[in-house]
């Protein structure tokens, strides 16, 4: 697991209040991890802070799974 992947999973676990072991790449935030729309907004903000990136709303709407969050962070991370 890459450093970015581990950091993304840690943020997701913290933001959604689930165990890190439950945060696997194929999990969807809403369907599998119980997130609501506010949770997803807060999750995107946490990812932006952690990786010093800006995620436009139209992109944020597409980040619906753990793997998509990891992929986005890997391709846009500055830190």
From Swiss-Prot:
Location of the protein in the cell: Cytoplasm
Gene transcribed to yield this protein: acpP
Species in which this protein is naturally found: Methylibium petroleiphilum (strain ATCC BAA-1232 / LMG 22953 / PM1)
NCBIfam families: acyl_carrier, PRK00982.1-2, PRK00982.1-3, PRK00982.1-4, PRK00982.1-5
Entry keyword set: Cytoplasm, Fatty acid biosynthesis, Fatty acid metabolism, Lipid biosynthesis, Lipid metabolism, Phosphopantetheine, Phosphoprotein
Protein name: Acyl carrier protein
Keyword Cytoplasm part of the UniProt annotation: yes
Listed GO MF terms: acyl binding; acyl carrier activity; phosphopantetheine binding
PTM remark: 4'-phosphopantetheine is transferred from CoA to a specific serine of apo-ACP by AcpS. This modification is essential for activity because fatty acids are bound in thioester linkage to the sulfhydryl of the prosthetic group.
Family annotation (Gene3D superfamilies): ACP-like
Source organism, top-level taxon: Bacteria
């Amino acid at each position: 697991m890459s450093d970015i992947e581990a950091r993304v999973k840690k943020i997701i676990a913290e933001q959604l209040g689930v165990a890190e072991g439950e945060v696997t790449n194929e999990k969807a935030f809403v369907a599998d991890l119980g997130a609501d729309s506010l949770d997803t907004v807060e999750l995107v903000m946490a990812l932006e802070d952690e990786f010093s990136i800006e995620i436009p709303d139209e992109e944020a709407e597409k980040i619906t799974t753990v793997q998509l969050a990891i992929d986005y962070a890997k391709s846009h991370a500055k830190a």
